[in-house]
Design a protein with these regions (language model features):
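Hydrophobic anchor at the beta1->P-loop junction of P-loop NTPases
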Residues: 29
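Walker A/P-loop
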Residues: 37-38
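Post-Walker A helix-loop "phosphate-sensing" segment adjacent to the P-loop in P-loop NTPases
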Residues: 46-54
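ATP-dependent small-molecule kinase phosphotransfer cores
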Residues: 57-120
């Protein structure tokens, strides 16, 4: 275990940061890749009441559809030395070590939203959401679902210029999707939302943030759809595995 991994494993959110989370309006978006998290977030951010919380990472910028990720827009790209400094100074709300890289949300990002009276919004993985929920039950967690397996597959395919490239990457994404759905369905705090229209999805999320909507029959109904999607993805994964 290297020093950075050790620092993350033993990282403790400072009390003042926990208090900040408890007294903030925070919206966390999760979902399988291709479900529409980014597009939904963009619709929400058209409303000036929301502020995008940009995570820090030590990984290098990637290219998506021929366009390179931008520092300060997609992520705050930092060096390992800077990450180590921030961890030692306890400047993160939460941090994790994934495939040799650091990912984390800084205290400063949440403070900026609070100073402007805004709702902090970010897309984050299941583990990160669990860390936030330990700090405050007021944090709103939303899991975005595609309408069904075939729609999800079609949306995902639109990202690729060749069918061969798509099929290769799609097969790799199936285990990740299975894991995310399994973990999300195991906990009670997610609002599952069926993303059949990005504008409508953003509208529903905005209602949840402002009306403190309790879980109701609709949540139960969409959870059933989530389980069906999980079954379909497992079936496809088993099919691909059997063909190898």
């Amino acid at each position: 275990m290297n020093n950075l991994e050790f620092l993350v494993k033993n990282y403790q959110t400072p009390p003042e940061a926990i208090s900040l989370v408890e007294n903030s309006r925070i919206l966390l978006l999760a979902g399988i890749s291709g479900a529409g998290k980014d597009t939904t977030k963009k619709h929400l951010l058209k409303n000036e009441e929301y502020r995008d919380i940009i995570s820090h990472t030590t990984r290098q910028p990637r290219e998506n559809n021929g366009k390179s990720e931008q520092n300060g827009v997609d992520y705050n790209f930092i060096s390992k030395e800077k990450a180590e400094e921030m961890l030692k100074k306890r400047e993160f709300i939460e941090a994790k070590f994934v495939h040799g890289k650091i990912y984390g949300t800084s205290v400063v990002e949440i403070e900026k939203a609070n100073q402007n009276g805004q709702i902090s919004v970010t897309d984050i993985d299941i583990q990160g959401i669990a860390e936030y929920k330990k700090m405050s039950e007021r944090v709103v967690a939303v899991f975005i679902l595609p309408p069904d397996f075939e729609t999800w597959r079609a949306r995902f395919a639109n990202r690729y210029s060749s069918a061969e490239e798509f099929e290769k990457d799609f097969a790799k994404r199936l285990p990740e999707a299975i894991s995310s759905l399994e973990q999300a369905l195991e906990v009670p705090y997610f609002h599952f939302i069926l993303n059949d229209d990005f504008r409508n999805t953003a509208r529903i999320i905005n209602q949840i943030m402002h009306q403190d909507i309790e879980f109701n029959y609709k949540d139960i109904e969409v959870r059933v759809r989530a389980r069906k999607l999980l079954e379909d993805i497992r079936m496809k994964f088993d099919e691909i595995s059997a063909d190898k």
